[in-house]
Amino acid sequence: MKDKVDSSRARSDAEVITASRFFDGSVLRGPTAVRVHKGLVESIEDHRGLCEHYLLSPGFLDLQMNGFDAVSCAGSGAGITAAELAELDSMLLARGTTRWLATLVTDDLRRVVSRTDSVRAAASGAPGCLGVHLEGPFLGSKLGAHDRARVLPPDTAFAHSPPAGTLLVTTGAESTEAPAFIRELAGRGVVVSLGHTAPSREQWDQCVRAGASMVTHLFNAMSPVHHRDDSMALMALVDDRINFGLIADLVHVSADAVRLAFSAAPGRVCMVSDSVAWNDPGSQRRGIELRDGAPRLPDGTLAGSSTALSG
């Protein structure tokens, strides 16, 4: 393998990074040397000899990241501060995540909007943060760890003017208002993902035709794969119009479920961490603690993950 990006530009002062395994975004390769000059890749070539690193990969993009360790995307007060967002960005960068969406979960809608504004205001100090993913409060019947008392039906008035910086919205698909809500958001360039819901086939088709293009964390908080009944997981797997997130921490889904997703839908799987700030005051107030490999509510309900995309 010898992929020259531009061999004429190779310079003696370029940095050469060697790794025993190199993932180029599609294929996992063997020992590789990558030559970099001023942040630009000049060449990618097979390498013979000792390698400095075990694995080299492009930076990860995480579309669903609620926080990490003691830093929540919601912040510790009215919203996240610039210092908190910068700390979160630094922790993720150290773990290989170079781009990510700050994910805000179900809460009072005014508080969600305020927190979205806080992320946008603080983002200049966190270059990895691309914007916000609103995972709630417009969810369906499969709520998981979300606060049922704060869930709202899809609101077209909100969709007509979503908070600046909102790039992705998760919504339920069962409500009669869902297609109009989706159409309004999609028309404004917001990616709409179906999640925390158990739609019928008719509801699914209406929402996808309206502009929904993703599914949030496949297999989790949705109607499961079934050979006869309406199954959101199955519809997502077979519908080529849809990409989907997958929490491949082997707690949220099994290894066989991961294999099924990649086999059934090559090119449509988006790995997400769904990591949470399991050590922040908000999690502690809810009684969230690490048990059996993931953060959980006192009743055992999964409340996100404790891993970055690098594992």
What does each model-found stretch correspond to?
Residues 140-164:
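Conserved phosphate-binding/catalytic loop of the ribokinase/pfkB sugar-kinase fold
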Residues 27-36:
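A conserved glycine-rich beta-strand in the N-terminal activation segment of trypsin-fold
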